[in-house]
Amino acid sequence: DQYIKIRNNSDEDLYADGMMLILSSGLNSGMNSEMIEGKDFRKECCAGNAFYCIPGNGQDVLVKAGESLIVVNNAQNHTIGNPNSWDATKADFEWYDVSSNENYLDIDNPDVPNLDKWYASTLTVQVLHNRGFNAVAIAMPPVGLTAEQFLAEYPLKDAQYIFHSPNGSDYTMPLRNCYRVPNEW
């Protein structure tokens, strides 16, 4: 029953068409890592390894001032299996993944629109970390940018960080299969 609530906290109505949800690359759970000097990209962009966009043509997904969108992993009635959960069948959108492993299939609710999947590094289904180790960000890519253009123009190459192990050793760790989202978005 994972979900993301996106609130329009402005005093004007806004359209969410094209809004990108980004799942960060790397773990954000502690102070046991640091960026390599001269290779810290964070002032220019964020790194992600999963990108989903709200579909629409510019004026299809209105979010009125003070209201919210709910995006869920599986738009199912979760109270059936857990009475303490909630009914996600009324969500605005769900993210859906076609899995390459028949043991880990996603559930698609045809009554809830799917986000447009631009990329996810997983070959199965994308889930949010149960303790928030990976950050979630939102961005508004330029109007007209396609998934194909994004993947061709925004790879994050040679990104690395230093992991400080509890055993006292430091390890240089690469960020693999990730793309950059400029902070201006």
Language-model-derived ranges and their functions:
Residues 1-185:
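Activation on beta-sandwich/Ig-like modules and their edge loops
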